[in-house]
């Protein structure tokens, strides 16, 4: 019996796969537990439609990420911060991924999720700093920061 897997089943198939399995196994286990459904011509068509929609959505997300990368790669895109500095040359407050995301939105209208900004520890130094940002699983860019003394 041909089935379409609705979830990953160890040793049998992954979600979205169409495979031939024994009829008893399909009816008594896979279909009862909603791990798979019978592969009729209609359900195969639905699956192909879903996969096309998923690919289209992924392509749109990638295109959006590339547009953000193009803006971040421009020389004039430099996020300005003015911080109070102590006698040792370190800032009183630290610059976090959240602050960077908010300032990027405020100064350039570019929306980047704070969870995508790769920051090992908050920034406490003044000067020009480049911070990597993971825009998409296969696309990274650099945010340029200019931190000056207030």
UniProtKB/Swiss-Prot annotation:
PROSITE patterns: RIBOSOMAL_L9. GO terms for molecular function: rRNA binding; structural constituent of ribosome. GO terms for biological process: translation. It holds the Pfam family Ribosomal_L9_C. GO terms for cellular component: ribonucleoprotein complex; ribosome. The keyword Ribonucleoprotein applies. It comes from the Bacteria. Keywords: Ribonucleoprotein, Ribosomal protein, RNA-binding, rRNA-binding. SUPFAM superfamilies: L9 N-domain-like, Ribosomal protein L9 C-domain. Binds to the 23S rRNA. Belongs to the bacterial ribosomal protein bL9 family. PANTHER family: 50S RIBOSOMAL PROTEIN L9. This is Large ribosomal subunit protein bL9. It comes from Streptococcus pyogenes serotype M18 (strain MGAS8232). The lineage of its organism: Bacteria, Bacillati, Bacillota, Bacilli, Lactobacillales.
């Amino acid at each position: 019996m041909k089935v379409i897997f609705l979830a990953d089943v160890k040793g049998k198939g992954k979600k979205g796969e169409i495979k031939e399995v024994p009829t008893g196994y399909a009816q008594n286990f896979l279909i009862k537990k909603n791990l798979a459904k019978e592969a009729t011509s209609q359900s195969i068509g639905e699956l192909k439609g879903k996969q096309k929609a998923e690919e289209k959505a992924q392509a749109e997300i990638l295109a959006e990420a590339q547009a953000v990368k193009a803006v971040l790669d421009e020389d004039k895109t430099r996020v300005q911060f003015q911080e109070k500095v102590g006698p040792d040359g370190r800032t009183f407050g630290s610059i976090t991924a959240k602050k960077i995301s908010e300032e990027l939105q405020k100064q350039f209208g570019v929306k980047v999720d704070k969870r995508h900004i790769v920051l090992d520890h908050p920034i406490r130094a003044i000067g020009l700093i480049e911070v990597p940002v993971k825009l998409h699983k296969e696309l990274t860019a650099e945010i340029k920061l200019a931190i000056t003394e207030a």
